[in-house]
């Protein structure tokens, strides 16, 4: 909560555990939270102590040990000591790290860098999402449409860009939409649950919620209906 510039962070019981001056705190991630102090962004640790001095125009959450920050219209990545691991640049746009890689945009195309800043997958896609479980969805122009598929960390397509909508991999499966219907693929790119559903959500604890017409179910990873929702 925030009163003026005095901020308090509470635990799940509602008890105040940290008092610190600042605004717009992020959630803690990897032990740190970003916040704004005197119009600049920095980081505090879980004791409320300033861990990285507020000097950035913007500062994002730590993921994979690195945080995306911006200064003077340029972006780069710092470690938890505040040292630049990937230097500031205005030549490209970045997103935060996930699964060891970060999205990078050059012009209107997207690719990926590793934690040393090396381009490991050249910006060649019209759209892309973070890597999850070793795979990322990408978007390509197919005729007059933009369709999605998936790549592995070597940039190899595991399925062509044939889907209208895609989700991240979760528990080894990814929800995809084809011809207006939803199904699921595995990490080999094989459609193992046919795209026959009007709605579907990602797998959790081995089951996925799906709906077809007025009927709804939880299915297992073979597509078998395990629970019928009445």
Go through the PLM ranges and name each one.
Residues 5-6, 11-230:
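Residue-level detector of conserved, function-critical positions
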């Amino acid at each position: 909560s925030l009163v003026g510039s005095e901020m308090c962070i509470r635990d799940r019981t509602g008890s105040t555990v940290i008092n610190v001056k600042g605004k717009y705190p992020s959630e803690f991630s990897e032990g740190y939270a970003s916040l704004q102090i005197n119009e600049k962004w920095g980081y505090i640790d879980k004791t409320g102590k300033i861990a990285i001095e507020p000097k950035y125009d913007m500062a994002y959450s730590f993921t994979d040990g690195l945080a995306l920050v911006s200064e003077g219209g340029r972006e780069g990545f710092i470690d938890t000591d505040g040292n630049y691991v990937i230097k500031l640049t205005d030549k490209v746009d970045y997103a935060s790290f996930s699964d060891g890689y970060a999205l990078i945009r050059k012009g209107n195309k997207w690719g990926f860098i590793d934690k040393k800043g090396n381009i490991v997958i050249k910006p060649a896609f019209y759209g892309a999402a973070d890597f999850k479980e070793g795979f990322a969805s990408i978007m390509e122009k197919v005729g007059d449409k933009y369709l999605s598929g998936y790549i592995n960390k070597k940039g190899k397509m595991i399925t062509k860009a044939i889907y209208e909508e895609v989700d991240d991999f979760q528990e080894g499966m990814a929800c995809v939409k084809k011809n207006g219907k939803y199904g699921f693929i595995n990490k080999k790119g094989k459609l193992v649950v046919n795209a026959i559903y009007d709605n579907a959500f990602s797998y959790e604890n081995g089951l996925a919620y799906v709906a077809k017409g007025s009927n709804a179910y939880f299915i297992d990873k073979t597509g078998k209906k395990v629970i019928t929702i009445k």
